[in-house]
Amino acid sequence: MADPAECSIKVMCRFRPLNEAEILRGDKFIPKFKGEETVVIGQGKPYVFDRVLPPNTTQEQVYNACAKQIVKDVLEGYNGTIFAYGQTSSGKTHTMEGKLHDPQLMGIIPRIAHDIFDHIYSMDENLEFHIKVSYFEIYLDKIRDLLDVSKTNLAVHEDKNRVPYVKGCTERFVSSPEEVMDVIDEGKANRHVAVTNMNEHSSRSHSIFLINIKQENVETEKKLSGKLYLVDLAGSEKVSKTGAEGAVLDEAKNINKSLSALGNVISALAEGTKTHVPYRDSKMTRILQDSLGGNCRTTIVICCSPSVFNEAETKSTLMFGQRAKTIKNTVSVNLELTAEEWKKKYEKEKEKNKALKSVLQHLEMELNRWRNGEAVPEDEQISAKDQKSLEPCDNTPIIDNITPVVDGISAEKEKYDEEITSLYRQLDDKDDEINQQSQLAEKLKQQMLDQDELLASTRRDYEKIQEELTRLQIENEAAKDEVKEVLQALEELAVNYDQKSQEVEDKTRANEQLTDELAQKTTTLTTTQRELSQLQELSNHQKKRATEILNLLLKDLGEIGGIIGTNDVKTLADVNGVIEEEFTMARLYISKMKSEVKSLVNRSKQLESAQMDSNRKMNASERELAACQLLISQHEAKIKSLTDYMQNMEQKRRQLEESQDSLSEELAKLRAQEKMHEVSFQDKEKEHLTRLQDAEEVKKALEQQMESHREAHQKQLSRLRDEIEEKQRIIDEIRDLNQKLQLEQERLSSDYNKLKIEDQEREVKLEKLLLLNDKREQAREDLKGLEETVSRELQTLHNLRKLFVQDLTTRVKKSVELDSDDGGGSAAQKQKISFLENNLEQLTKVHKQLVRDNADLRCELPKLEKRLRATAERVKALESALKEAKENAMRDRKRYQQEVDRIKEAVRAKNMARRAHSAQIAKPIRPGHYPASSPTAVHAVRGGGGGSSNSTHYQK
């Protein structure tokens, strides 16, 4: 470490403009600026700082005034600190961070990230840099890592030089401004902010961004290191103004407490008389211990509000800045000595120690002589000048055994120092233990949250299962009710069927009895008629008068009976004729509908088979067409690439010919000059033989040089040709890949359009099938109505049959009583019976035909439903295939983009490898840390206008 030097803390004062709330409130602008270093608040005293920045100061001007010099100092091996102090909503975060990615409004931290690398790019190429960054916040007086949110209570320890540091904080190695900005974005996203009455984005914690830079000269092995603390303090708050409550109020308490501890440290350092500085009252002051009164160049930016509403806080902030301006820091370069330098320093200290020992011996001898009462002459005494020249640089006494009191005090002081050291060590151990317990508590808390989430998800799943079980139970109950209803209906149908069967049997037996009785009566009637005719023949002559009267009576009765029978038959014939006509029409309609359904099914099967054949042919043709198109596109791409390659080669050939011509011209000039020299030297050949020999040697050297130039030119030409061939090969591969991907994309688009058209066709077919299903349902309903009509007509027939049987029984009885009038009535009754039996037989046939047709339609129904389900499944399969095709297209597009990015990275890396040499930024590889960009090599950034290249000579 170099010799220390004393410097003061720089204090910059920045006033923000009035915000909208203050303008609407009508607040007065109270600061008055006098020059660049003085500001007056109202009618009060002037406040003088290193620089006063008015509201119209740009972010770039703030950076140039506050931070630009510190960046240079850090790169020269010094420590640096920049932090913003002020009340809430005074512009601290805007000053330190601003808008991170806005070139005009970005603050000090992002500008430093770019400026550091700009300085490195302009430094010596023999320098190698290691840059690592950390980002943490102090929230509720606990150190929380913003790059690893699981570390919530980190401890502050001291290294071997008694410099505080945060133990266990995440460190990221960076090699470019973009990586630094990525770290800042990541940490900023994890920082605590809240909304108050004074600020919409109020910082609820102190954030510290630490940049650690180590540089090494690879030739001289000189090593320098510097740390840069960039601190964004949370603002002091008045609860009456911010309206904080709840958790925000607790945060405000801790913020004010830590800022009060910072004020106490500043006051103690400003007074300069206190032996104890309360660094340990707050973790923030403990971390900034080296920045306040230690080995660090520190700049404080005090941010103030210009509003009269915040006048008291503004004056308090200005007083804080004036106190801080009086603090002196002792800074020195953080230099790591080499072995040779340590050896020289050891020899120097050894010589100094030897001189001090000789002085000590002379003084002891002189003291003994004085004690023995001997007077020592002045020329033998050691003068004060000699003592001063031989004193060590520190003011420790040379003679430490003058009085035993000094030894006792030193021993007691060492004892106290050891005790303080042990207490500090115990405190650090307690901090470690608290940190471990906090991390364990956080892990347990996270596990509890995970268990709660798991329990909640289990509870949700249980509720879903319960709902599903309830729904299934309800459906089961409904199904049971339906089954019961169906069984009940079947039982009722069975009972009705048994009843109807019993009734039919009863009616059949009654009909048979009536038929037997009718046959008996007919036989009896025939016998009686025969006997009557015999009796009439026998008594014809005797009863002629009676016979004529009887014949007249029979004739009248026959006419009356015929008239009655004819009317009955005619009425019955009309009724039965209407029923038969309706049954015939229904039978014809059902048979016609059945034939149409069968023809439609056959037509649909034919169309499906034809469509499948056409689809197969079309798919085969499309595959052949796609293959041909791919082949044609590949050939066209190759032809185009070869044409471009030939053009490039022609241009390069012309360039080489031009260069060859220029070289030939130069060679001709040299030969002409050589000939001129030979002609000029021929006259003086004898006199200047020695000079000619020298000329021959020069000529040989020139020819050798030309030959070496020719060989170098040839090598360079071959190398350029190899590079051109390699680049052309890469370009051809990229073009071929691009052509293939474009063709694949076009093929996928065409497949998508085809699938879409097929989907539309399937929807049309599905609509047709649904329409056909509706027609079938309508036919089923019509058939049910027809069956009901047939049942009613059968019931009517049964009723008519009963009436007919009753009427027949009545007439038979009458015919028995009226023997003479039975002939005509018997014929009419037989005619009625035969007609009714024929109608009954026809109705039975029609009923059976309707039942058969209904059964056929019911058999066709499952087939049609199966085809409908198959069509729906086919539609779903087409939809899933379409979705899968879209996903494949997206994956191919992503893969193509990744391949293009990879090729771009490879080309960029090759281009960067040709850049000029400058200072390097090495990025070591650490076990357990995933790399941010390339995992294969260590990145090194080169300055002097260069880019980044790969450096594999240093890995950790």
Curated annotation (Swiss-Prot):
Pfam annotation, one family: Kinesin
Region named Microtubule-binding: 174-315
Subcellular localization: Cytoplasm, Cytoskeleton; Cell projection, Dendrite
MF terms (GO), sorted A to Z: apolipoprotein receptor binding; ATP binding; ATP hydrolysis activity; microtubule binding; microtubule motor activity
Modified residues (Phosphothreonine): 403
Enzyme class: hydrolase
Region annotation Globular: where it falls in the sequence: 859-956
GO CC annotation terms, alphabetical: axon cytoplasm; axonal growth cone; ciliary rootlet; cytoplasm; dendrite cytoplasm; distal axon; GABA-ergic synapse; kinesin complex
Kinesin motor domain span: 8-327
Catalytic activity: ATP + H2O = ADP + phosphate + H(+)
SMART domains: KISc
Ranges for region Disordered: 910-956
Main location as per UniProt: cytoplasm
Family: Belongs to the TRAFAC class myosin-kinesin ATPase superfamily. Kinesin family. Kinesin subfamily.
Protein name, per record: Kinesin heavy chain isoform 5C
Gene: Kif5c
